[in-house]
């Protein structure tokens, strides 16, 4: 593992995973630091519901790396993909149910493809610039 990185992402939950993938995809030397021994945060460590809507009304408003992740999950038989649902609150009418273990696997595989290093069982208590 290198000692100097262009970008360090702290926290391997859904947002941290996507941020690290984006950084790696753009060619930055990237390190993702996660306190647990696996990625996914609340999406894999708890009984969290489905992946939130990628749609607003009939339009898909979330694309890019999150959609690439969803596509890979479907390919690995780890997600239903976007399923049309009721929309009682007006927040989106599609959800993606997923397998927590496949989520962890797909996250690691995609991060590796983007050249991101992962440091597990680690926390940050200060940063000097």
Spans of features found by a protein language model:
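Beta1/beta-strand and adjacent pyrophosphate-binding region of the FAD-binding site
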Residues: 1-15
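Membrane-embedded transmembrane-helix bundle of lipid-linked glycan/lipid transferases
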Residues: 8-10, 19-24, 31, 128
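Short alpha-helical segments and helix-capping/turn motifs at coil-helix boundaries
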Residues: 14-18, 104
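A short, structure-level motif marking secondary-structure boundaries and short turns
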Residues: 3-5, 18, 91-93
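Conserved N-terminal/central alpha/beta ligand/cofactor-binding core
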Residues: 22, 28-29, 35-126
